[in-house]
Amino acid sequence: MALGETITQNVFGGLSNDFKKKNFSLYGQWISIFTIFLCIALGIANIFHFNLVIIFSVICIVQGLIVIFVEVPFLLRICPLTDTFTNFIRKFDGNLPRCGFYLLNAVIQWLSCTLQATSLIVVAIFFTLASACYALAYAKNQEYLKSSIDVTGTGQGGALEAQVGEHVVRNVL
């Protein structure tokens, strides 16, 4: 029980610290992490339509999986991925590239409304909000920051990327 409390305290403490910094890139990151869950859940929920919305629901699921790697970069180290994909994901390491990435994802999901109004509009709204946060961070010349959540309790904090210990080796065979 104590371990669960420690993890919860570290997560919510990091979340609280992130919002105190008033940096729009952190807001964009948190909106994007929430959007991952929306993409997967609503993509699966809308896959049962019997029209072309199925295409957009599959695209939504794929978008959610790609956003996981964009927002949680330590997964690039532990998952066996091609160097091409890894280099593609690393191109979005800044406010302006992420703004464009999320804007493109939003446009794709807004296009799903031309076929039928479904719950995919929620995904489009959240992609638009994430893009707007990164655009505001760029416009205000705010530094691109990563979350300071410390799930491990090591006190190192600083970026979801830093949470993988050095003992993890990317083994692609």
UniProtKB/Swiss-Prot annotation:
One of its GO terms (cellular component) is Golgi membrane. It comes from the Eukaryota. GO terms for biological process: vesicle-mediated transport. The chain crosses the membrane at residues 28-48, 50-70, 96-112, 119-139. Glycans are attached at residue 23. SMART domains: Cg6151-P (SM01077). It is a multi-pass membrane protein. InterPro entries: TVP18/Ca-channel_flower. Pfam families: Cg6151-P (PF10233). Disulfide bonds: none annotated. The keyword Transmembrane applies. It is found in: Golgi apparatus membrane. Keywords: Glycoprotein, Golgi apparatus, Membrane, Transmembrane, Transmembrane helix. Belongs to the TVP18 family. Golgi membrane protein involved in vesicular trafficking. This is Golgi apparatus membrane protein TVP18. It comes from Lodderomyces elongisporus (strain ATCC 11503 / CBS 2605 / JCM 1781 / NBRC 1676 / NRRL YB-4239) (Yeast).
